[in-house]
């Protein structure tokens, strides 16, 4: 296990011990990380991973902790949050963004530079790293449509670049998940557009999101993947599950595809409610819902 003294001499690194992850997750649930680290440079991240490897320390890397539930027992070993790796650069029609850059901010950079194609992501919570990891998407667009390459690091600290085809994108899936890689940055190829039209489209999508999604409460975003031929929210509605609550977490009355933390709920409440919804939807429609949200950590 990595020791505090192992981390003291790594520059550009903030470290916290026994830190509640509920302070950082969008759901506002999650037990403590043994060690929580915030590298501000690629060099700091590299050194951190090398130290973890040499001390046989388990590593969990998080982007912006949005489409995620951390269990109440927390996460053992080292947890790395990439939120300080947030630079965004523009060159011609290409945007390169580091893993910790927020999607919303990257879409604003695209608009300011008259680049279109990234509008779909303007309301998706979370970071570039997390979005690439799960091929995030909304309103007919997804990351795989605009990504041209991705810089990644393995657990030994080796850096490589994957092309879009090497990313093996699927629905809410990429090779990053399979190979335990860390996203460092991603390059996106966009097209020339009119900044006013781009902003109008982003305004339209944000209005749709705000009118349909329960943004007033903590949540993990969309809980379930879209089943083939169906909509998860519609199936949940048809099973009369809207408003059903376990502990402090309920199926949103505004959008059945969301579960919101309305009364200081915990991760156990989320897991129980997810299991309950899966059972009842299966019973009502015969369709088995598959969670889109990642659930990690110890109970």
Swiss-Prot record:
Disulfide bonds: none
Gene Ontology annotations of biological process type: cell division; cell wall organization; peptidoglycan biosynthetic process; regulation of cell shape
E.C. numbers: 1.3.1.98
Catalytic reaction list: UDP-N-acetyl-alpha-D-muramate + NADP(+) = UDP-N-acetyl-3-O-(1-carboxyvinyl)-alpha-D-glucosamine + NADPH + H(+)
GO molecular function annotations of the record: FAD binding; UDP-N-acetylmuramate dehydrogenase activity
Coiled-coil ranges (or none): none
Compartment(s) of residence: Cytoplasm
One GO CC annotation: cytosol
HAMAP family, A to Z: MurB (MF_00037)
Role this protein plays: Cell wall formation.
Protein name as catalogued: UDP-N-acetylenolpyruvoylglucosamine reductase
Organism per entry: Lactococcus lactis subsp. lactis (strain IL1403) (Streptococcus lactis)
């Amino acid at each position: 296990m990595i020791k505090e003294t192992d981390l003291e001499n790594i520059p550009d690194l903030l470290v916290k011990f026994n830190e509640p992850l509920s302070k950082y997750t969008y759901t506002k649930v999650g037990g403590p990380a043994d060690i929580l680290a915030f590298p501000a440079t690629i060099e700091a991240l590299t050194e951190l991973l090398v130290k973890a490897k040499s001390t046989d320390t388990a590593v969990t890397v998080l982007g912006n902790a949005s489409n995620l539930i951390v269990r109440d027992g927390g996460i053992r070993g080292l947890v790395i949050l990439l939120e300080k790796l947030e630079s965004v650069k523009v060159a011609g029609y290409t945007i390169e963004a580091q893993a910790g850059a927020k999607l919303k901010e990257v879409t604003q950079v695209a608009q300011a530079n008259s680049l279109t194609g990234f509008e779909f992501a303007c309301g998706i919570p979370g970071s570039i790293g997390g979005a690439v990891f799960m091929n995030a998407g909304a309103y007919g667009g997804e990351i795989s449509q605009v990504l041209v390459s991705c810089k990644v690091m393995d657990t030994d600290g080796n850096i490589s670049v994957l092309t879009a085809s090497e990313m093996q994108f699927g629905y809410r899936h990429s090779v990053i998940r399979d190979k335990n890689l860390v996203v460092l940055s991603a390059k996106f190829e966009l097209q020339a557009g009119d900044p006013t039209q781009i902003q109008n489209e982003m305004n339209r999508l944000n209005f749709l999101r705000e009118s349909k999604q329960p943004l007033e409460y903590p949540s993990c975003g969309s809980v379930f993947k879209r089943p083939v031929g169906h909509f998860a929210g519609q199936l949940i509605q048809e099973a009369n599950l809207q408003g059903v609550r376990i502990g402090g977490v309920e199926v949103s009355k505004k959008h059945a595809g969301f579960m919101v933390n309305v009364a200081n709920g915990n991760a156990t409440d989320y897991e129980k409610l997810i299991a309950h919804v899966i059972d009842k939807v299966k019973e009502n429609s015969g369709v088995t819902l598959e969670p889109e949200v990642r659930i990690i950590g110890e109970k």
